[in-house]
């Protein structure tokens, strides 16, 4: 970036010196004026860009990435965001990546050797600092393929950590602890269970068993911070069918409220949203797509929303929990802050 600034600055200096020689060449002068305007615009963008020092300020004792809805074979914003995640990781030092579903669009994967594992994942997230544990959940697009292959890929890749369809993972360091509870949301939603030709594995999963597990896991959790992650939202602004959220509100939300979890985070909607619900202390978070986003507008309960693509950085200390929305330029466009 320093080289870019220097080069642009040199151009502007040279332009000012040679400009008098173009007084009679109106077309060239106009071109130079346009080019100067462009250079000034680029310099303004560079001035607004986030630096490694800015990224370092986002961190806590424990730090994590969360990304989702990225499986586009590297197209759209997937590759640039993956490269950004790698550069930022040098400063943020995340413990892991929480992958909140739809790593693979559009029909999931057929097997552990499906080429999509390379084009959607391995070859895209190839930065050395992304060679760390990834903890995924299944999204609706994974449910269009072979969901067991997504679990079995843990036997192929050393960084793919998926012991079950739903599971939890605790981290602790220097007196700070956080538990991520990762749930399998597609089988909780009626329309996926009923569309057996399109989502063949959804109806085979027990809703009751998963809800009992969720309740008992949260009952036993003693960490400073509890973050529940699923692919589908409980509350969100979206054009998707309302029954998806109604099913999540009926099945999942009462358990989360009972145990007063800190954050419920999801993907699926392809934009950034932070919502609160009356009578609940939970921060409901929609993490944007790390490839291709959609428009969004505020609704009742909206604290923030943005159509930007990107990912999130979660940072925890003993007294605070922050979730930062990061856009594709590396800028923290919004922060959800919780304190004790």
Where are these regions (language model features)?
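Extended active-site neighborhood of metal-dependent phosphoesterases/phosphodiesterases
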Residues: 58, 105-226, 241-247, 251-263, ...
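Residue-level signal for glycine
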Residues: 330-332
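Bacterial Sec-dependent N-terminal signal peptides
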Residues: 1, 5-50
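Active-site flanking residues adjacent to catalytic metal/cofactor-binding acidic residues
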Residues: 68-69, 101-102, 183, 230, ...
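Generic beta-strand structural signal
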Residues: 66, 99, 277, 316-318, ...
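N-terminal active-site segment of His-dependent metallophosphoesterases
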Residues: 47-115, 208-209
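Residue-level marker for buried hydrophobic side chains located in beta-strands
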Residues: 64-66, 97-99, 136, 228, ...
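C-terminal structured domain segments across diverse proteins
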Residues: 233-234, 269
């Amino acid at each position: 970036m320093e080289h870019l600034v220097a080069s642009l600055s040199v151009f502007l200096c040279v332009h000012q010196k040679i400009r008098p020689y173009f007084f009679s060449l109106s077309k060239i002068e106009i071109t130079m004026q346009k080019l100067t305007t462009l250079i000034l615009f680029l310099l303004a963008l560079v001035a607004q860009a986030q630096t490694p020092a800015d990224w370092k300020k986002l961190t806590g004792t424990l730090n994590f990435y969360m990304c989702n809805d990225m499986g586009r074979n590297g197209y759209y914003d997937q590759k640039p965001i993956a490269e950004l995640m790698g550069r930022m990781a040098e400063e943020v030092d995340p413990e892991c990546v929480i992958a909140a579903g739809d790593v693979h669009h559009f029909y999931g994967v057929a097997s552990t050797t499906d080429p999509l594992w390379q084009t959607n994942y391995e070859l895209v997230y190839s930065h050395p600092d992304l060679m760390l544990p990834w903890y995924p959940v299944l999204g609706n697009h994974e449910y269009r393929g072979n969901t067991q292959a997504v679990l079995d890929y843990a036997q192929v890749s050393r960084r793919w950590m998926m012991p079950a369809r739903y599971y939890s993972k605790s981290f602790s360091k220097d007196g700070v602890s956080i538990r991520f509870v990762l749930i399998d949301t597609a089988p909780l939603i009626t329309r996926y269970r009923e569309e057996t030709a399109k989502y063949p594995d959804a109806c085979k999963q027990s809703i009751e068993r998963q809800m009992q597990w969720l309740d008992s896991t949260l009952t036993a959790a003693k960490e400073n911070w509890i973050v529940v992650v699923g692919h589908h939202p409980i509350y969100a602004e979206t054009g998707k069918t309302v029954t998806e959220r109604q099913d999540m509100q009926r099945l999942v939300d009462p358990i989360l409220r009972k145990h007063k979890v800190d954050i419920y985070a999801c993907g699926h909607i392809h934009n950034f949203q932070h919502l609160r619900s009356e009578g609940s202390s939970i921060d409901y978070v929609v993490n944007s797509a790390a490839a291709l986003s959609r428009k969004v507008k505020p609704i009742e309960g909206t604290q923030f929303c943005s159509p930007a693509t990107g990912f999130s950085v979660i940072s925890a200390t003993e007294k605070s929990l922050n979730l930062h929305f990061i856009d594709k330029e590396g800028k923290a466009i919004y922060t959800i802050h919780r304190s004790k």
